[in-house]
Every structure is written in C-alpha cells, then in structure tokens.
Amino acid sequence: MDSREIVERTITYTAPARLAATLPEPYWNDLVHVNYDLPGFERAWREVRPGRQEYVDEWGNTWARVDRTSKGEVSRGVLESWERLETLTLPDLAHPAHFQRVRAVCAQRDETRFRVGGLPGFPFNVARKMRRLDQFLMDLLLAPDQVAALLRRVEDLLAEVIVQYAEAGVDGVMFPEDWGTQLSLMIHPDMWREVFKPGFSRLCAVAHDRGVKVLMHSCGKITAIIPDLVEVGIDVLQFDQPQLHGIDILAQFHGQMTFWCPVDIQKTLQTQDERQIEAEAQELVEKLGGPDGGFIAGYYGDNPSIGLEPHWQYVACRAFVRYGDYARAAV
C-alpha cells in the first residue's frame, strides 16, 4: 500500500495499513504539494525602512511584516474603495499554461504520494485581504451587496482553478482559511451559513465531481461550524491547535471528517515536557484515527515562530510513529 492509497484510505475510513503522516526525515511524508506558477510574479520581500519589509501579492495587496520569518499581514488592500469593484482585475490563475509543472509532477510514475494542489483560500480568505480584515468584517453588515458580488467573482475564479488542478491529475486541493479567534468563530455562525456556506458547497462539489478531495487549514476555534464543513464536503481539516476545540469534541466527528494535526503548538508543545507531548500524540492517534482511518499526523513547519527547538516536535514524531503502527497495535 503506497502513500497515496494510505491517505485515500485514511480520508475514506477504509483501513489504511499505517498512520498517514506529514513528518520530516527520517520519518515519512505521505503528501506532496504542487502549485500553479504565475510567470512574472515573485513573492520578494523588500526592506522599506529598518525593521519593516513589504511586498505586493498577485492580487495587488501590499503585505508588511516586522520580522523575517512570519508571513506578515496585509497593510493595504487592493480594493480600498468599493468604487473600484467593477474595474477590479483578478489574476489569471486558471490559465492552463500555469499548470505545466503540476501536470509534470502528477505524471511521474515514481511519485506515489498523495498530490495536493494549493489554492490561495476560499472566497473569504481572498476577499478579506482585498479590503483588510477589519474593514471586511464591517462590510458584511454595511455593504452586503458589494461583498456578495466580490465573493462570487472570486468563487468563479477558484472553481476554474480547481478544474485545472483536476485535469492536471491532483488527488486533492488544499486552501487556508483562518476563521477563528481563540474563543469562537470571527462572525456569528448563522452569518457564516448565510454568506459563505453556499460558496463552500459549490467549490467542494466542483472538486468532488472530478474525484478530487478538499483539505482545509484553519486557525482558531471554529468548532461551531465543523458540522457544516462536514455537510458541504470538506474532507480534511488541518488544525495546529487541536486542544482549542478539545480532542474529545473532535473525536465526535470520527467517521465523518479526517483531522490532520501536529501535537498542539500553543499548549502542549510549549510545555517542553516529553511525557505530555507523547501522551497527546497517542491521544490524537487513538481518538481521531486508528486502524479504520481518520487522522493524519502533522509537523508544524515553522519552529522559530513558535519559539521552540525542533527537538520537541521530534518527540511527537517518535510517538506518532509508535502509536501509528496499526498492524502491531492489532497483535
């Protein structure tokens, strides 16, 4: 059973041979990420003054950061005024020529990992940057018609991108969409259902109709809409803070949703206690996964930003491997 089949069986709850994982060497990584190219665009940070870097993204948004490791945040959106909406030009992400490298990776016979095409987000993650998050959240109440028009344009573009990925041969598409704070969803769940859920349903259907799985990353406590995400067709939820939801709460979705998590980066890893880290790794495997599937073990890729030496995640990796040997566990 190769990596692709292990991930597929994990997502569909059809008995993978072992734990699916995205761990660094000397362990295993069952996923390979492939992305479209944008000729002429380079994400290059430039120093605008001491201690501040900026770059302009493919949408026209200006990003800023005050360190050298984080992804930064939008400081000026391309759509500062709704008067520009009708003339706003979106990048041609879905041009077939941009997927040549994706097609090449998917055509490699020796590439046996689960192939995941990257999306810039679903409509919220794209639109909120064009207006800046603070303004966009106000727009939901103050300019609902303009918000709906912008979301639809972005949704149409993303649907085309998903089609191109499917035709290139990917197994899944993945998008980031940070919907939560430490306490709850950023907006009332009913508003999310009214404004955003239809777009989720449509884009998941575009993927599923072409045999492509949908993977979503989100930070924050979005527990209130997990049942909705199951309903619309999200196949995998990638959480870096599983303790924020409660592992026992997530376990209630066993059989309906696959979770992909490292040991909690905010709480458990920060203890730098090997016993606690190992115990959570075991709990994640046994409560969210197991021999029938449902869990992918993760590794947070930016140790400097969480203030930890790699050692502490390697403690988690060893525990994931130990408890993810389903054949041995069955003996």
Q: What are these model-derived regions, one by one?
A:
Residues 19-43:
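Short, basic/low-complexity N-terminal boundary segments at the transition from targeting/disordered tails
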Residues 1-26, 89-331:
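Active-site loop segments of alpha/beta catalytic cores
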Residues 2, 39, 57-60:
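Residue-level detector of functionally special positions within alpha-helical transmembrane segments
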Residues 32-36, 67-69, 129, 309-312:
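Short aromatic-enriched loop/helix-cap "lid" or pocket-rim segments at secondary-structure transitions
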Residues 38-55:
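Short acidic, Pro/Gly- and aromatic-enriched capping/linker segments at domain boundaries
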Residues 13, 32-37, 51, 60:
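Glycine-centered secondary-structure boundary/capping sites
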Residues 50-99, 107-117:
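A contiguous, low-structure linker/loop signature
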